């Protein structure tokens, strides 16, 4: 009973007030085992009582036939000796039954602990296997992801290169246009300046009203304190200048 796991196991147990095993190695027996032990102890006690009741009847019969006893010449055991021997045998059988129950309880506890440990180990193994599968799948997808990332980078680099080329071409075109505009503007400026200079040189003007101008200057010099004396000359000079301007506008209009 108990299997190979309980063979050779040293068990220490304690007895309660009714001399029944209750605790072994700090492990308390279950109620089911205690109930079975109680039932078997009750059965053993009833068997011992019936055995002790039958012993005196045998003794009485032997006493009623002393001649037969003496005739055989054999020594018969007394009732007390027979009862003591039966009690020892019953105690031994009780001890064996209790040992069997203890071995069964130990086997049950060992099996429960083994199952719990196996369950924990299985859960841990499954968790580690799941994590390993996840890492493996990540590792399998990683090269494909790297290739895709590399392609994306190449595509973006190509787009940037195209944009750089486009902007360089646009900048070069703008610089060329600006240079052409500058040259054209410079040519137009020089042409306009040359034409203006030619027009100015072609027009030569003689002084107008020179006589009146000389008379006014002379009058002002002679009449420094009384400038009003030269007012008539000034009016004539203004009329002469106005007439000369009109003639100039009319001739070049």
From Swiss-Prot:
The disulfide bridges present are: 209-240, 219-230
Q: How does it sit in the membrane?
A: Lipid-anchor
A GO cellular-component term linked to this record = mitochondrion
Assembly behavior = Component of the mitochondrial contact site and cristae organizing system (MICOS) complex (also known as MINOS or MitOS complex).
Residues forming the CHCH domain are 206-248
Q: Where is this motif: Cx9C motif 1?
A: 209-219
Cross-referenced Pfam families? MIC19_MIC25 (PF05300)
Q: Which GO terms describe its biological process?
A: cristae formation; DNA damage response
Subcellular locations according to the entry:
Mitochondrion inner membrane
Which positions carry the signal peptide feature in this UniProt record? none
What name has this protein been given in UniProt? MICOS complex subunit mic25-b
The UniProt keyword set, sorted, is: Coiled coil, Disulfide bond, Lipoprotein, Membrane, Mitochondrion, Mitochondrion inner membrane, Myristate
The UniProt entry, under InterPro entries, shows: MIC19/MIC25 (IPR007964), MIC25 (IPR042860)
Q: Does the keyword Lipoprotein apply?
A: yes
Lipid linkage positions (N-myristoyl glycine) = 2
Primary localisation category:
mitochondrion
Q: What does this protein do?
A: Component of the MICOS complex, a large protein complex of the mitochondrial inner membrane that plays crucial roles in the maintenance of crista junctions, inner membrane architecture, and formation of contact sites to the outer membrane.
Q: Family assignment? A: Belongs to the MICOS complex subunit Mic19 family. Metazoan Mic25 subfamily.
Q: Which gene encodes it?
A: chchd6-b
Question: Low complexity bias: where?
Answer: 44-53
Query: Where is the short sequence motif Cx9C motif 2 located?
Result: 230-240
